Regions:
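Alpha-helix initiation and N-capping motif
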Residues: 12-15, 76-79, 122-126
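A motif-centric signal for short, conserved binding hotspots located
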Residues: 98
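Long, contiguous N-terminal structural blocks used for assembly/anchoring
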Residues: 1-73
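Long, low-complexity intrinsically disordered regions enriched in Ser/Thr/Pro/Gly
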Residues: 69-95
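Acidic, proline/glycine-rich low-complexity IDRs
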Residues: 114-139
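Surface-exposed polar/charged interaction patches
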Residues: 21-25, 29, 85-93, 108-113, ...
Length: 140
């Protein structure tokens, strides 16, 4: 019940802002750009393709193989649920600093705009995406 109430306050634009922040620098150390085939595999009801793995190194030839550990397809509600899990005062996913950014975004929410995604930096966006993908923080 409470989870649904929290999730309903996170707008589609809030989710997109979190994903954009993560893609711009939050997840780039553990995730790589999806291929056309991975994008094409997007199931109905899912909006985002997150590939856990590494791309070939742009300079060093000895590291020229793309490695994929998993391909994760997320819906907006998957991201909302991860945010909700991280908002919980008793959460054990992240340290107090990252938790504080998430709390600040919730505290400064408005009826019209949802949460204040301006508080979600690359580190916070990273852990939101990790919890959405893996239900844990594996990296960082």
């Amino acid at each position: 019940m409470i989870t649904q109430q929290i999730m309903s306050r996170i707008t589609d634009q809030n989710v997109q802002d979190i994903i954009d922040t993560a893609a711009a620098g939050g997840i780039t150390y553990w995730a790589t750009e999806p291929t056309d085939e991975e994008f094409a595999g997007l199931p109905e009801g899912k909006e985002y393709t997150i590939v856990e793995g590494t791309a070939p190194h742009p300079i060093f030839a000895f590291d020229d193989v793309r490695e994929v550990d998993s391909v994760n397809y997320l819906s907006k509600d998957d991201v909302r649920l991860a945010y909700t899990k991280l908002l919980d005062p008793g959460q054990e996913y992240v340290n107090r600093e990252l938790h504080g950014y998430i709390l600040d975004s919730w505290r400064d929410r408005t009826e019209a705009d949802g949460i204040d995604a301006g508080h979600i930096d690359a580190g916070a966006a990273d852990v939101i995406v990790q919890v959405a993908c893996f239900d844990e923080v594996r990296y960082g």
